[in-house]
Amino acid sequence: MKGFLTLLLVCAILSTGYCQSRRRAALTGLVAGATIGALASGGLGAGAGGFGVGGFPVGVGAVGIPVAVGGGIPYGYGGYSGYGYGYPAGGYGGYSYGYPTGGYGGYSYGYPTGGYGGYSYGYPTGGYGGYSYGYPTGGYSGYSYGYPTGGYSGYSYGYPTGGYSGYSYGYPTGGYSGYSYGYPTGGYSGYSYGYPTGGYSGYSYPTGGYSGYSYSSTPGYGYYGSGSGMGGMRSGYSYYSSPAPSYYSSGSMTPGYGYYSSGSGIGGGMGSGYSYYSSPAPSYYSSSVSPGYGYYGSGSGMRGYGYYSSSTPMYYGSRSTGYGPFSSGLGGMGSGYSYYSSSTPSYYSSGSMTPGYGYYGSTSYPGPGYGSYSYRTTSYQPSSYGYSSYGTTYPGHGHWHGHKDC
């Protein structure tokens, strides 16, 4: 009898408004939690860029750093997908011809919506979209022929609306725009033929700024400075931040010093490279080099593709080999396009070597035949002499230095 009365009491309590309200609150919390989780999976854009829903960051923050690099359209799930022709939804999507929605999407011909989208011909909406021919809306988008709306967009022929846009032929409205033929309205604009309204311009017609010299190179001095180099066939086109003086001697040098700086190199026909890099310390080199040291530095070459991180020294020739977790390399034509992180010094001797040292540093280079081009990130590599490759010496100073083989 006592058990029956207890059961009746429990049922009575459950039928009260108190318990119903508790259940409603629990349900509301569950829905809210799921919603927040979904938004978080898409990534939250930093600062003024707001947040991205499902991997669709629509802008970058106050410091231009999109943080949405995952989630998005659930066509498949992440991981390090190299040569993924399907629908990865996240992870390191290299050579993804489908619809990656996040992660490091390199050479994505589909519709990546986030992450480091390099050579994205589809519709990336965020992340580091390099060579994006579609409609990226945020992130570091280089060579964007579509309609990027934010991020570091280089060679944007569409309508980028913000971020670091280089070679923007459309209508970028803000950010660091170099070679902007459209109507950028702000930011550090170099070679702007349109109507930029402010910022440090390197070789820009409307405004001023700290311009460099030597074969149309425009090194910068200051936080989030920008520069471009077009010198000859072995020149480099670069964007970079430099809160400290940059030094170089000849060619299209693009040294950088700063946090989240970027740089690109396009020179020597097919023997060129396009890279972004960060350098919080002075860089010293001699000819067509783009060394970097940074947090999330990136680089792109013209041949091969690979991502890898390394915590031990690397010794290799003109291949993009790696040592460590998630390492991949593509030999092919004896070249490699590689991103990697390395926490220990790397050494090399000749060819297209791309050693690195740093946190999420990156490097790129095309293989021999078309020239060797290497970017690297180093955080501790003291050298008073430097390296000699192909008869060219690349001196180092202090902790940082890099080189490009032409």
UniProtKB/Swiss-Prot annotation:
GO terms for cellular component: membrane. Expression is confined to the prism and organic layers of the shell with no expression detected in the nacreous shell layer. Also expressed in the mantle edge, extrapallial fluid, hemolymph and, to a lesser extent, in the viscus (at protein level). In the mantle, localizes to inner epithelial cells of the outer fold and the outer epithelial cells of the middle fold at the bottom of the periostracal groove. Keywords: Biomineralization, Chitin-binding, Membrane, Signal, Transmembrane, Transmembrane helix. It comes from Pinctada fucata. The keyword Secreted does not apply. The keyword Transmembrane applies. One of its GO terms (biological process) is biomineral tissue development. Residues 78-197 are annotated as: 10 X 12 AA tandem repeat of G-G-Y-[SG]-G-Y-[GS]-Y-G-Y-P-[AT]. The chain crosses the membrane at residues 26-48, 58-80. It is a multi-pass membrane protein. It comes from the Eukaryota. Binds chitin and may serve as a framework constituent participating in shell formation. Inhibits aragonite precipitation and may regulate aragonite growth during shell layer formation. Does not affect calcite crystallization. Its main location: membrane. It is found in: Membrane. Residues 1-19 form the signal peptide. This is Prisilkin-39. One of its GO terms (molecular function) is chitin binding.
